[in-house]
Amino acid sequence: MYRLLSSVTARAAATAGPAWDGGRRGAHRRPGLPVLGLGWAGGLGLGLGLALGAKLVVGLRGAVPIQSPADPEASGTTELSHEQALSPGSPHTPAPPAARGFSRAIESSRDLLHRIKDEVGAPGIVVGVSVDGKEVWSEGLGYADVENRVPCKPETVMRIASISKSLTMVALAKLWEAGKLDLDLPVQHYVPEFPEKEYEGEKVSVTTRLLISHLSGIRHYEKDIKKVKEEKAYKALKMVKGTPPPSDQEKELKEKGGKNNEKSDAPKAKVEQDSEARCRSAKPGKKKNDFEQGELYLKEKFENSIESLRLFKNDPLFFKPGSQFLYSTFGYTLLAAIVERASGYKYLDYMQKIFHDLDMLTTVQEENEPVIYNRARFYVYNKKKRLVNTPYVDNSYKWAGGGFLSTVGDLLKFGNAMLYGYQVGQFKNSNENLLPGYLKPETMVMMWTPVPNTEMSWDKEGKYAMAWGVVEKKQTYGSCRKQRHYASHTGGAVGASSVLLVLPEELDSEAVNNKVPPRGIIVSIICNMQSVGLNSTALKIALEFDKDRAD
């Protein structure tokens, strides 16, 4: 009997092992039952007890707790044990093979995102990273929909805000390459509905090139020209180093500029993402003046770009075209009208063709009526520091400057297409097996060349180029800080913040001769909370992955 019981117990334990191997698939698989022999009756009770006991012990050793799908930290591409076989629809998805060499960078970057998310009180945030053209990490933290406890995931769709400007630039560049658009003709050549302008009694010309780099003098959301000029003067005064004590006039200017700064920063630093440090200094909220810019919250639907021009076309220019940088989303509304006239297509139709070419199949204009899968809700903090839904807005007046929805994956595709076009001309193509870029190398070089008299407000080391901010390579002292060349654009809208950053590889002869483009790191981050500065976070993440890539 002892020999028989030992045999049955061993068989039961052996059967139990694979069923409780630590994976969800194994945990739900029903184990096979032991085969009963003819002499079993005498020890039935004891035999079953020993068998079940062995099965329970092995199961408890191997079982892994299953995280609830509602856990907001549980979505995205994460590093899991090989035994954890997960269904495609589960909140965790196994890390792609390309990610396994970046485990340190992923862990470090995830920790950084948790810190940023907690610091600003953001409901949800999604990140994506690609290395040399391959997506190696994407993950969502927190909630896409707080009310229904829908977790963020890589497929979550959010407002990308001013990254829309970089998308519009591709349309302009394609038309320029095709000879259908002259960047230096007055805009009235394409859009006669936009009136000719004067500045201080002098007739001036607004061109497509000036619009792209925010040098046209067309206003942003702030309509008070005096406030804007005082703020610009105050900022210029603050940047002067080593000056003597201010005069009475300078003190007055500082006082005026400081007061106005509180008001005019709402649409720019608080909504357009231009002051990362200020955004981080306190929890984002509905502070005084945050919601006084009525045009940010328009509910009116505009049928086309020409109709949208009536919001600003008769307003005076704030500066002489070409003289000063004034960030303007309305300038891109005029650019959308130029795209329509130069292409012969409606702006959105032309953009959808571009998205199709770039394989950006989840990128669409934001509209309230259509059902858009995986669309997040958008949030802000009220005066009582309570999380609330943002008011309904209609962005049809500014598709080109801040009206698109997208995912981190689509933004990575876009970044890689731009990087490929930028680099492909530098690579040896002896077998002619490299395909042309979506944009020509000379076009990309033009787009990523800093423009004089501009500002890159999300990184003071850089300048604005053509719908991208660009920081150039620089090192002033030996064995000291080295500034890497990169291009990026941030975005800030009602209830949303975003960034797309491209860190090109510093190519050497070995890479040029033996490798293929794109070479570099792309980082995209989207968040369903307004006023969250993300550029420095994206740059830190890019540098973390660049370290692992170099090892």
UniProtKB/Swiss-Prot annotation:
Mitochondrial serine protease that acts as a regulator of mitochondrial lipid metabolism. Acts by decreasing protein levels of PISD, a mitochondrial enzyme that converts phosphatidylserine (PtdSer) to phosphatidylethanolamine (PtdEtn), thereby affecting mitochondrial lipid metabolism. It is unclear whether it acts directly by mediating proteolysis of PISD or by mediating proteolysis of another lipid metabolism protein. One of its GO terms (cellular component) is mitochondrion. SUPFAM superfamilies: beta-lactamase/transpeptidase-like. The modification N6-succinyllysine is found at K287, K288. Its main location: mitochondrion. Its EC number is 3.4.-.-. PANTHER family: SERINE BETA-LACTAMASE-LIKE PROTEIN LACTB, MITOCHONDRIAL. Residues 248-279 have a biased composition (Basic and acidic residues). It comes from the Eukaryota. One of its GO terms (molecular function) is identical protein binding. The keyword tRNA processing does not apply. GO terms for biological process: lipid metabolic process; proteolysis; regulation of lipid metabolic process. This is Serine beta-lactamase-like protein LACTB, mitochondrial. Keywords: Acetylation, Hydrolase, Lipid metabolism, Mitochondrion, Protease, Transit peptide, Tumor suppressor. The lineage of its organism: Eukaryota, Metazoa, Chordata, Craniata, Vertebrata. InterPro entries: Beta-lactam-related (IPR001466), Beta-lactam/transpept-like (IPR012338), Mito_Ser_Protease_LACTB (IPR052794). The modification N6-acetyllysine is found at K301, K346. Residues 1-113 form a transit peptide. Induction: Down-regulated in a number of cancer cells. The gene is Lactb. The active site is at S162. Gene3D superfamilies: DD-peptidase/beta-lactamase superfamily (3.40.710.10). The keyword Lipid metabolism applies. It is found in: Mitochondrion. Belongs to the peptidase S12 family. Residues 69-101, 237-287 are annotated as: Disordered. It comes from Mus musculus (Mouse). Expressed predominantly in liver.
